[in-house]
Amino acid sequence: MKTFLLAVCLMASSLSSHADQENTTLVRRYDGKMVPVPVLGSAEAQLITPRKHPDNFQGVKTRAIDPNTRYTPHTGKPHILVILANFKDVKFKVKEPKEAFNDFFNAPGAISDRGNGNNENYGSVSQYFKATSRGVFEPVFDIYGPIDLPNDMTYYGGKKANNRDDERPQDLVRDAINQVKTMVTNIDRLDSNNDGYIDCVYVVYAGLGQNNGGGATSVWACTSVINDASLKIGNKNIYNFSIGAELFPSLIRHRANAQDHTMQINSIGVTCHEFSHAMGLPDIYPLTSSAYLNNQEMEFWDLMDGGEYAGNGGFIPMPYTAWEKKQMNWPVNIQLLTTESSMTMEQTANDGGVVYKITNPNDKDEYFLLENIIQTDWYKGASNKGLLVYKVWDYDKVNMGDYPNNTPGKPRIAVVPADGLCMSSYKIQRHESTEPNYKELNKQEQRKYLEQLKGDIFPGTSNVKKLNFDANIPNFWWYSQGDINEKTTLNANYYKVNQALDNISISEDGKVTFKYIADYKRSTGIHSPTVNAQEDHRIFTLDGRYLGTNTEKLHKGIYIINHKKIVVK
């Protein structure tokens, strides 16, 4: 699970069980401290930063071990069982919970506000998937509860603030199913492919999630499986499940007065992300600390990365990328660029617009995808509009536990950033409370991260109109040799891409145009890598990490500055 303004916090929380089991008067701040609940959209709310995963998380490659893993069907209108679950000591705070979460999951149009900021969500979970699949997948969620679990929150959530080894998500799901199994009607429709298994069980548990504002005893949102032949609903077995929290760590935006402590219902982004795991998609962010690098992932441009928190905290999550649509076999118009020509992109992939592809001539599984991002409909949460270019090093049998970006400096799916830096959320600087004015400094760091995202796409905030090997942009290279046997300046391990883009522009209404160059080296003539290269004084390490422009802070070593190797002694 990725984060909004994200940083994995390493500080342990030593708060009382009472505070953690939240009367929801306190939420977990980025530094691990429990603080009063802020108002949605306030400056203080920016300091409540969700976490990607517990510090001790070790993924399991479920399908690599079991090739017959049953993923949730992703076509048609399968019925998904949703259980609203109270803990023994923490109850639902959302008004009209069954109706509110029916809207959350199933509303066909605008969501009505039932008193908990319900209409902050741009649409329902079902609407999201209908839009991003172009109508091929429109799940229907059957809502039951709230039911009462037999144990306190601590039993399921444990007491550790920074890892999940003391949590019991399977027990939570098992107990929820045992409470609801005699209530469920039309059991057969919960098994759309008639394989004897309920397609998926989604449990919404009361209160906050530890991944986003909850204390040490709260539960992490997650997706996993249960292997228990005795656990059934009717004659149907249970396997796939996802769980997520009831509440978002903020008070509603429009309060009656300062004494109004009405909590905000959760955003749909985490639910869309976790449910996508149940359908087989992996996390796109790295899960190993050695890969917590800039230019290593997709950040806010992908639901399976930070995009689950797009739209001010996940209220307008990013649609699937073209790569993800392709994995699901959903309609996506991907066209290979081969001949030099001028191209126009008028629509997003969600609207059926073309997605262009540039492929390594010697490796069909290595390519770049070009998508038009227009800040309309489900793309309203995007950081900017323009041409999104991302590198893909594809592989067979994509699975939930693959972690494609865990190899440092060699991501399988990562942004090609127009401004030379797709900043990792792991790299956001955190000022400690011992520093003067630390709160304001941290807000500035978070704003800086969000502002930097705007430069990832073309032309972006830096007005970058070209993409070629002279531009020395990270991730614009081949891992294996393409049609020229020359290594890149930024990273001597990888090869130059001989294809290029020129005259990239975007109109006010979001239309992207560019010229595709099939043989950049021939079109520019024989030249050294520095010919026509812009001197921008950007500093990179030899493995392509961007370090800014201040040479005074450099340690001893070799760096790339203005496309040349510079030795600092």
Segments (PLM) and residue ranges:
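Zymogen propeptides/activation segments of proteases
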Residues: 3-4, 16-242, 351-522
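Exposed beta-strand face motif in extracellular beta-rich ectodomains
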Residues: 277, 499, 557
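Positively charged n-region of N-terminal signal peptides that target proteins for export
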Residues: 1-5, 569
